[in-house]
């Protein structure tokens, strides 16, 4: 049963090119088990009964999106991406406002190249944060020993990992709160790496919700190969 979970909007920033993949197209359009990475990233949201709608931010000259079957899904709306991730997300939020979405609506921002989001993680995030005053994100506690390096690549110190988490997506915040944080950070020329960092800069503390470690982001070729080996596990 999902009736107790809050309704939400999804935002997918997908205007990047993923240069580290060294592929012939943006990494979100590479194939994975018969679908593109992007399609896998969208499906967990499109299959959720509490989804109010989804906004995807794409490069203005994106030649691949229109060929995907999901491009014709009436629940998906396209906007132009920005120069950086934060600009792409902000454009999507502005579009939601223009469509009449409320400042109090929940928005979940998810990486276009993170195709292995488990439905159980999505439901847990929604349930845990439904009444949270700030919002939060899926994350995983650091498992490996962490080293801080100098500019020459030599170890300076070993970092205490007991309080270190690896940030994942989705990241879930109120539309108005996230909009203001992103807009203000851009005006102030602050470097924003994800939505949670914008909320932190605005003086609030997002909540960490532990998720599955296999909700990985495809960044390098070996990430895609690992996912291809596990594609039979999709749809959990």
UniProtKB/Swiss-Prot annotation:
One of its GO terms (molecular function) is 2-C-methyl-D-erythritol 4-phosphate cytidylyltransferase activity. SUPFAM superfamilies: Nucleotide-diphospho-sugar transferases (SSF53448). The keyword Nucleotidyltransferase applies. InterPro entries: IspD, IspD/TarI, IspD/TarI_cytidylyltransf_bact, ISPD_synthase_CS, Nucleotide-diphossugar_trans. Its EC number is 2.7.7.60. Keywords: Isoprene biosynthesis, Nucleotidyltransferase, Transferase. The keyword Transmembrane does not apply. It catalyses: 2-C-methyl-D-erythritol 4-phosphate + CTP + H(+) = 4-CDP-2-C-methyl-D-erythritol + diphosphate. It is an enzyme of class 2 (transferase). It holds the Pfam family IspD. CDD domains: CDP-ME_synthetase. The record marks 20, 27 as: Transition state stabilizer. The record marks 161, 217 as: Positions MEP for the nucleophilic attack. GO terms for biological process: isopentenyl diphosphate biosynthetic process, methylerythritol 4-phosphate pathway. Pathway: Isoprenoid biosynthesis; isopentenyl diphosphate biosynthesis via DXP pathway; isopentenyl diphosphate from 1-deoxy-D-xylulose 5-phosphate: step 2/6. Belongs to the IspD/TarI cytidylyltransferase family. IspD subfamily. NCBIfam families: ispD (TIGR00453). Catalyzes the formation of 4-diphosphocytidyl-2-C-methyl-D-erythritol from CTP and 2-C-methyl-D-erythritol 4-phosphate (MEP). This is 2-C-methyl-D-erythritol 4-phosphate cytidylyltransferase. It comes from Pseudomonas syringae pv. tomato (strain ATCC BAA-871 / DC3000). The lineage of its organism: Bacteria, Pseudomonadati, Pseudomonadota, Gammaproteobacteria, Pseudomonadales. The gene is ispD.
């Amino acid at each position: 049963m999902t009736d107790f979970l809050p309704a939400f909007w999804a935002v997918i920033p997908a205007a990047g090119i993923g240069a580290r993949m060294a592929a012939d197209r943006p990494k979100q359009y590479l194939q994975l088990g018969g679908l593109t990475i992007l399609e896998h990233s969208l499906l967990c949201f499109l299959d959720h009964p509490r989804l109010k709608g989804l906004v995807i931010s794409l490069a203005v000259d994106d030649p691949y999106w229109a060929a995907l079957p999901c491009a014709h899904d009436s629940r998906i709306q396209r906007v132009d991406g920005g120069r950086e991730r934060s600009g792409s997300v902000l454009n999507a939020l502005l579009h939601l406002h223009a469509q009449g979405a409320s400042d109090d609506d929940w928005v979940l921002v998810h990486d276009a190249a993170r195709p292995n989001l488990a439905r159980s993680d999505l439901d847990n995030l929604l349930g845990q944060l439904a009444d949270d005053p700030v919002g939060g994100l899926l994350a995983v506690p650091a498992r490996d020993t962490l080293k801080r390096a100098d500019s020459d690549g030599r170890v300076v110190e070993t970092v205490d990992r007991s309080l270190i988490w690896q940030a994942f997506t989705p990241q879930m915040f109120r539309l108005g709160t996230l909009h203001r944080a992103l807009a203000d950070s851009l005006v102030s020329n602050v470097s924003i790496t994800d939505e949670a960092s914008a909320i932190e800069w605005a003086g609030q503390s997002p909540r960490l919700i532990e998720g599955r470690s296999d909700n990985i982001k495809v960044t390098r070729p070996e990430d895609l190969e690992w996912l291809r080996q596990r594609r039979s596990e999709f749809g959990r």
